[in-house]
Amino acid sequence: MLEAPSYLVSRDLPSSCEEESKWIYNAHCVLQLSLRKRLLDDTDVEGSSAKKMLRVDHGSRGESDKITDSLQLAKTYQSSNQSQQGGGGDQQSSPVTRLDQNALLNCLAHCSLSDFGSIASTNRTFRSLIKDSELYRLRRAKGIVEHWIYFSCRLLEWEAYDPNGDRWLRVPKMTFNECFMCSDKESLAVGTELLVFGKEIMSHVIYRYSILTNTWTSGMQMNVPRCLFGSASLGEIAVIAGGCDPRGRILSSAELYNSETGEWTVIPSMNKARKMCSSVFMDGNFYCIGGIGEGNSKMLLCGEVYDLKKKTWTLIPNMLPERSSGGGGDQAKEIAAATAASEAPPLVAVVKDELYAANYAQQEVKKYDKRLNVWNKVGNLPERASSMNGWGMAFRACGDQLVVVGGPRAIGGGFIEINACVPSEGTQLHWRVLASKPSGNFVYNCAVMGC
């Protein structure tokens, strides 16, 4: 996943430069990227025409001082390394080295993920720091988050798009297994990991992709293996709720996953058992919406919210957004409930702690009024977003944007398209195409990683 344009790292240094100068140059590049990232973050950019290159303002004394200090740190770091190597000492035990690495981590935390590949290719130290989970913990602590959109349009194959760098990312192919390939799969991005849940011949299985190692691994297990559940992540943690166990029983149980420790913890169960539900985090709480309950094929109209601090679930009646084209109000909800078995789980996403839902039948997007427990139309879906009863199209949040991943129906090929819009109070949604490429146009799974 550490990919970058080669021109960012192939710049020639003056012939008189020694290793110390290279260190200063490398640190200077990191600071330049860091400052450019901050300038881009502080600039109001809208629409596809806003992709610009901004130059760092060296007239700002505060930032210039930071560059000078960091260049001096880089010089000290190199001098420390040379003295350790010359004296035969243990480099790892040097307190100065550790201090300098912390300073470099702080600089790297402000750089864009799009630039990490270039930075990693400059030397082993930067490469090691970028593969260190501590860097991403530091970014979260500073409130620095960028998002990558992962999706699968071909079985066992994943690809990703980086909106900030406007580039497609290669993801290694998953290990081939016919049973897993044909099973229902759920996906979840949490921390620096992409989790894909499915079933092999004898048991459920979880495949984990790490952007730090660019590899897939398996072997991790929940306390209660399941499928067809609702899930959502918040930083380094995720919650899964409901679903079906290996015997097909619909579950009310829930678990919390910590990506930093790799541990699954059982949390209190929901009030109602449900499968094929959808989940989001909003206002720091976990919501589970809709789903099919025990003993029937009708969609549950209620939702539930889990308070992570109080560790309690609260039922929310009639929270399900309208899902049919058969009119409004309770009648539409009853029609939607009756046809639940053939429909995808509710298409919901949260942007700036506001909940949105996509109605594939009416091609509409609605916003949830938390105070009144009602849904109000705020716009339409992109024109070329198609689905089969909600299947094959992804509706997700990507930072401050809503994104729709999908493509028009086509015979013998097609393309995938990523549309995005920034929802704003009192205005209709204005969609724009972020990216498109030749691909299968049925989205099997999709997850947005923020790190």
UniProtKB/Swiss-Prot annotation:
Keyword list, A-Z: Kelch repeat, Repeat
InterPro entries named among the record's database cross-references: F-box-like_dom_sf, F-box/Kelch-repeat, F-box_dom, Kelch-typ_b-propeller, Kelch_1
Domain of life: Eukaryota
Any one GO CC term of the record: nucleus
Positions annotated as Kelch repeat: 137-188, 193-236, 237-284, 286-333, 349-395
SMART domains, per the entry: Kelch
Domain F-box: 93-139
Record Pfam families: F-box (PF00646), Kelch_1 (PF01344)
Protein name per its UniProtKB record: F-box/kelch-repeat protein At1g74510
Organism: Arabidopsis thaliana (Mouse-ear cress)
